[in-house]
Amino acid sequence: MELSEHFTFGVPGAKFMPSYRGGFWDGKIRLFDTKTNLIYFGLRFELARFAESRGYKFSLFDNSIDITKDDVNDFIKHLKVPLEVRDYQLDAVYHAIKHSRALLVSPTASGKSLMIYCLIRYCTLKQQKTGKKTLLLVPTIQLVSQMFKDFQVYGFDAESNCHMITSGKDKDADKPIYISTWQSVYKMKRDYFAQFNAVFVDEAHLAKAKSLSTIMEKLTDCPYRFGLTGTLDGKETNRLTLSGLFDVPKNVTTTKKLMDSGTIAKLKVNCLVLNHSKEDKKIARIIKTYQEECDYLVLNKSRNLFISKLATTLKGNTLVLFQYVEKHGVPLTEQIRGMTDKEVMYVSGITKSDEREDIREFAEKSDDVIIVASNGTFSTGINIR
């Protein structure tokens, strides 16, 4: 009971969840299973601290392998990647290989896909004698295509070696690497996941979602586990869950370091505060619900006109994100198109994955395109160099 209580936490926002309100769940997450007496391997150091603080005797299993950073560097050079592998990327790949599992925290534009590629090539090399496969999970169908094409850029024959899985696609193929949205495979039975001995989760902070945790728990015979994310939200429950599923977080680099080194452009945020008309303010005062407030904002003609003018006058590629498709995204796109000769591209959930990838590639080759996209399609992991 003492161990169970130590690894039991209240879930933030649980009181708003239907299962809690209905009395089916107490709003807590338990990382130690009292039925099986098992706990996530990634929590071994947390468990050791628990035992040490109470004077309990324990032995800690060392899962690291005998390999040097020079060995890893030689392996990466052998891959002949046509891009520079930076020092922090080498450090991250070495750390992951050394421990056979890792949770790498690295910001946007730090080259996470290159780190994933190097690690996948290492895993496939180790799998040649076993016939096992590698599973790469990403949160969106667009990232499935983007990761596939990134591998091609790195000089890999992705067509022969990678199987892309999205909703409605075949879940099996005679290829060593599967790239899938986690939504496409989470309902598969445990037997399906037995074919993998390496799993990668991009945007791993989403692993706090129950369906993705379920996938990880089905991978019972999977020694290689790697999660990559640009952020951890600071909540103890999420940090421990991610640590358990993968390993103790390793900070690879920071956005500031990337800016200081010139790897990415300096970031400047301009926050624009709009002063609404007296008539609009009167309307706003009688709004009672959050949904009414959202409707007021997205349907406000003056506000939409300001957004459209701003988008058409900015220099360089411009991204306009929206939440509501029919009420906001569609009319906003039409208004912007009517005000400019620039290329205006629209992306929403119904846009096919190959079309989204074509738009992303077009934007990479352009310097004056406007993309109007739903928040769900362009909010996570999209990389336009």
Locate predicted features.
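Hydrophobic anchor at the beta1->P-loop junction of P-loop NTPases
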Residues: 104, 136, 320
